[in-house]
């Protein structure tokens, strides 16, 4: 089981590297964030099932709820940005500007 956990951790690291490399487009960043959340969900589920901790059995479901909320907010932001600016480049966003 250690090799499965290692592969899932590597998938998380690869998705994190994708966020750092493909940060020019918002859609690419959102896809990499979803990959990170999916690998975290699988890792938490496997760790809970391996350790037989019944008190934390709701944690994967809570993680899925937060992942769905993150996806919804991200897609709403993507639609708003693409209708306002005409593209999804992250360079157009300057959130510190008044």
Curated annotation (Swiss-Prot):
It is found in: Mitochondrion inner membrane. Keywords: Electron transport, Membrane, Mitochondrion, Mitochondrion inner membrane, NAD, Respiratory chain, Translocase, Transmembrane, Transmembrane helix, Transport, Ubiquinone. It is an enzyme of class 7 (translocase). Its EC number is 7.1.1.2. GO terms for molecular function: NADH dehydrogenase (ubiquinone) activity. InterPro entries: NADH_UbQ_OxRdtase_chain4L/K, NUOK/Mnh_C1-like. The chain crosses the membrane at residues 1-21, 28-48, 61-81. Belongs to the complex I subunit 4L family. Core subunit of respiratory chain NADH dehydrogenase (Complex I) which is composed of 45 different subunits. This is NADH-ubiquinone oxidoreductase chain 4L.
């Amino acid at each position: 089981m250690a090799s499965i956990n290692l592969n899932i951790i590597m998938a998380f690291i690869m998705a994190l590297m994708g966020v750092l490399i493909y940060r020019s487009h918002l859609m690419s960043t959102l896809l990499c964030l979803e990959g990170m959340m999916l690998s975290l969900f699988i890792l938490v589920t496997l760790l809970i099932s391996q350790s037989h901790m019944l008190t934390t059995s709701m944690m994967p479901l809570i993680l899925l709820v937060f992942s769905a909320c993150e996806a919804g907010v991200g897609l709403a932001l993507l639609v708003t940005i693409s209708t306002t600016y005409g593209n999804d480049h992250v360079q157009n966003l300057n959130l510190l500007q008044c």
